[in-house]
A protein has these predicted regions:
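Non-heme Fe(II)/2-oxoglutarate
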Residues: 1-78
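Catalytic core of non-heme Fe(II) oxygenases with the double-stranded beta-helix
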Residues: 60-187
Length: 187
């Protein structure tokens, strides 16, 4: 079983669904500008959990929980200088439109964000039996078909500079929570 149980995943989803839905977008690596017309790279629906919009159903507690979780994971595995949380994004990839996100990094080296994203976290909110396709892959690490990444409640954390992707969902609906943690530039 994953780190989060079914009830915890349902609670996370309830919090996320109180925020407005948007089309997933891609940042142009040359200009740094948001490009919402790149469908071949990314097709998804997203909701950003923004504390400035208010505390809906416990979004403040969710921020606290995720911050505490990354502190433990970072201490045990990465030892990065983490100072904050960039944002929380709830993402849906639907088989009806072949939802996907092709190879990308969460850190843009040619147009660095300030502060830079250092660790990326994804939490699986849908059990793999509820959709087809949609494999989460990390270059040179997690390969297609690695079943533990599809277990409900699974948490995956990796350096934001590592290329990763979500393969097209061919049937059903894949839901996940993505969180980016920031800190000073790498030395």
């Amino acid at each position: 079983p994953g780190y989060y149980n079914k009830n915890a995943c349902k609670k996370i989803e309830e919090i996320c669904l109180t925020f407005p839905e948007k089309e997933g977008m891609v940042q142009d690596t040359k200009t740094g500008k948001i490009n919402d017309t790149i469908n071949k790279v990314r097709r998804s629906k997203v909701r950003f959990i923004n504390l400035q919009d208010g505390d809906f159903l416990g979004s403040h507690e969710l921020y606290t929980e995720l911050t505490n979780l990354i502190a433990k994971i970072n201490k045990d595995f990465f030892h990065f200088d983490i100072k904050g949380l960039d944002s929380i994004q709830y993402t849906e990839y639907d088989g009806s439109y072949k939802g996907h996100y092709d190879w990308h990094t969460d850190w843009n080296w040619s147009n660095p964000m300030n502060p830079p994203r250092k660790l990326s976290m994804t939490i699986q909110l849908t059990d793999g039996s509820e959709y087809e396709g949609g494999d989460f892959e990390i270059a040179h690490d997690i390969e297609p078909g690695y079943e533990p990444t599809k277990q409900l409640g699974t948490v995956i954390v990796f350096p934001s500079f590592m290329p990763h992707k979500v393969a097209p969902v061919t049937a059903g609906l894949r839901k996940s929570l993505v969180v980016w943690f920031t800190g000073p530039k790498f030395k």
